[in-house]
Amino acid sequence: VDVKTLAPKLRHNMPDWLAQPLQEQLGEESFRALATSMNVAAPLDLRVNVFKAKREAVQLALAQAGIDAKPTPYSPWGLRVEGKPALQKLDVFLKGEVEVQDEGSQLLALLTGASRGQMVVDFCAGAGGKTLALGAMMRSTGRLYAFDVSGHRLDALKPRLARSGLSNVYPVQIAHERDD
């Protein structure tokens, strides 16, 4: 099938109500680049738990396990992995030295500037990816509250928190953003 002959919503894998305003705003060439990028699988990024390990050591351990990992372009904690390896079986994962986390989320944590001894609140903690990054930045000191309305998502944080080695994280389920 020649992709160029398909209807726009099929060609770009995007509904017309979204494609039309984007195309008008971006122009044809930029829109095509955006649509193409949205139809490609995202890379697999890892965040090294700097409370427990160094990026170079984790990269070496991954290489010894036959996994090609390169430093991410922007995050000083990140490694970009080729393919989709079974990370949950690796020693670096089991020991909490590495977590799956996209580079954008790593950068958000970095931008907070959280540091030792502070009190920090993550109001939409979910399963805790950014919470764990913040805790490592704080070197497991101070108090880090992980708030979320979903107890189920906070439950997913517990095994990750145990692996991380952090002791300054306090998960709290709240009713809503104005919870007393």
Task: For the regions a language model picked out, list residue spans one by one.
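S-adenosylmethionine
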Residues: V1-D180
